[in-house]
Amino acid sequence: MELKLLQDNGQLGAGVAASPEVFGRDYNEALVHQVVVAYQANARSGNRKQKDREEVKHTTKKPWRQKGTGRARAGMSSSPLWRGGGRIFPNSPEENFSQKVNKKMYRAGMRSIYSQLAREGRINVVDSLSVDAPKTKLLADKFRAMGLDSVLVITDNLDENLFLASRNLAHVLVVEPRHADPLSLVHYKKVLVTKAAVAQIEELLK
């Protein structure tokens, strides 16, 4: 199969050969969903904190004597049963949200995503991508000429100028093939891959 070559003026050129084992697979929606959700979960860090009965600032004095008042017995006012008391199972920043996806499933999910992008015409190949200086304007003008506004760039050689020029563009992400993740692939409207990076992707996902 072939991926379309995107020229600097935004026109599509001749096709570039690509492996059908990576870019020609059937779309497995359930697997892609599982891989994306697992990626998001593994990137998540806990930021919720609630107090249990030990952490609540209350006196430990017994509110009233054990027997003889007619009330239910009570040990301390920090009890989870009381208003203002601690939580029984409080949320903690140390919670583990990670989900396990084995390598075989992850690679199959990535192949499915790349294949769907190829079918939808959202992935194109460029000979190379570089800028002469680490200037955001240079890269922004290049993408504007190509008709791109939201783009994930997968390059075989992430040089410093390209990285620095892309860093201040809100809807542009430049990565190497081994750092391309499922969430970014489905998030951006277009995916640009350099010719050399196509071979690297095929090697990673074979």
Swiss-Prot record:
Gene Ontology biological-process entries: translation
InterPro entries linked: Ribosomal_uL4, Ribosomal_uL4-like, Ribosomal_uL4_dom_sf
Keyword list, A-Z: Ribonucleoprotein, Ribosomal protein, RNA-binding, rRNA-binding
A cellular component term, taken from the record's GO annotations: ribosome
KW Membrane (keyword) present: no
Region (Disordered), start-end ranges: 43-78
Domain of life from the UniProt record: Bacteria
Entry keyword Iron: no
Basic residues compositional bias, start-end: 59-70
Record's compositionally biased regions (Basic and acidic residues): 49-58
Molecular function in Gene Ontology: rRNA binding; structural constituent of ribosome
Pfam families found in the cross-reference section: Ribosomal_L4
PANTHER family the record matches: 50S RIBOSOMAL PROTEIN L4, LARGE RIBOSOMAL SUBUNIT PROTEIN UL4M
Subunit structure: Part of the 50S ribosomal subunit.
Protein task: One of the primary rRNA binding proteins, this protein initially binds near the 5'-end of the 23S rRNA. It is important during the early stages of 50S assembly. It makes multiple contacts with different domains of the 23S rRNA in the assembled 50S subunit and ribosome.
Family membership noted in the UniProt record: Belongs to the universal ribosomal protein uL4 family.
Protein name per UniProt: Large ribosomal subunit protein uL4
